[in-house]
Amino acid sequence: KSLYLILAIDWDGNKKALGFWIKNTESASNWLDVFNELKTRGLEDVLIISCDNLSGISQAIEAVFPQTDVQKCVVHQIRNSLLKVSNKDKKEFVLDMKKIYQAANQEFAMQNLDKFAEKWGQKYPSIIKSWYTNFVELTTFFKYPYELRQAIYTTNLIESMNRIIRKNTKTKGGIQSVNYLSKITYLTLQNASTKWQKVRNWFM
């Protein structure tokens, strides 16, 4: 089963769970259904959505929330890149990657990507291609104030919540019913939400 989880930050900087869905597989079409349901429930004026790089997810977002910015998770991009890098290159490779997403702005990020590509492109062409293909949506966060970028450029909030849910739903009994998984997920979210704090520097 695949868990579809939507966590949000409202205009006051408060974190909220908008909902979760349990489906057989993860796909862009299923995400499209989720976004449509949220819109039907009244969700509107969505400023930005942070997501992973699932094929078709950007198109699903645009179909339902055409004015919304899309931010692909930089951490996912880094992890996927490093899977293809030899151990002897990793330390230097990581330092060069950091110059892209830690640049002062999008223009400098592109300049650093060009240098990155010049240095590593021949050895790791598929990684370089991925960075160029996804560059615009990997660097959306540069449009926002520096103080807020940490809450935008990664899906860490979702990832940490998913780890807790996975731990709580993992049992020795094997596959559990959707009803059981739903109850545990709901209770886990309820418990976690009592500890969520307002995003730091939200009103700066």
Question: Model regions: which residues?
Answer:
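Short, charged, low-complexity patches
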Residues: 28-31, 90, 178
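Conserved beta-strand -> loop -> alpha-helix junction used to position metal-binding or nucleic-acid-contacting
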Residues: 48-54, 60-96
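RNase H-like nuclease fold core
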Residues: 1-50, 64-67, 134-137, 157
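Acidic/histidine-rich catalytic cores and adjacent linkers
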Residues: 66, 99-204
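Alpha-helical elements of the RecA-like P-loop NTPase motor core of helicases
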Residues: 29, 55-59, 129
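A generic short alpha-helical patch detector that favors 3-5-residue windows
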Residues: 23-27, 49, 70-73, 85, ...
